[in-house]
Amino acid sequence: MAGNGVASIGECMLELSGQAGPNWRMGFAGDTFNTLWALHALSGDRPATYVSAFGDDPFSRDQIDFFAQNGIGIGASPIIPGARPGLYAITLTGAERSFTYWRGDAAARQLASDAAALAKSLENQALVYFSGITLAILDDAARKTLLA
């Protein structure tokens, strides 16, 4: 029997925005997370799972806690010792938004490092979403694992 959950696979980053002097507002965002957020809001009681890899740092723990507080699980997504989430900042020049990214060593790049955990995270899902950005952050071997 097919499951009824919705899952999204990718990288949810720390977002710095709303700069007011030296102060910034921090949140969590990214294409696949934003999509899951909307699907979860529209899907009633369907379980929602964000499939990624996370660090063991305080920001990653805050991210996982934020998901849980909003009814979004992480399945069997691995926690990678010493890893941390990607980060981006939004700056404004007049009405023009600019984005600066720090994501080269983000934990999410390892989301397919454990094929069994990835498969377990995707069990019982009626809908699985990922994006071109998801594929772009993975190396060739990880892309093959994800698409297998």
Regions found by a protein language model. Give the residues of each.
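Conserved phosphate-coordination/catalytic loops
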Residues: M26-G30, A112, D140-A141
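Conserved beta-alpha-beta core of the PfkB/ribokinase-like small-molecule kinase fold
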Residues: L127, G132-A148
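Short amphipathic alpha-helices and their capping/turn segments at secondary-structure boundaries
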Residues: M1-N4, S113-S121, A142-A148
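Alpha-helix termini
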Residues: N23, L42-S43, R84, A117, ...
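Conserved N-terminal subdomain of the carbohydrate kinase-like
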Residues: L16, P47-I133
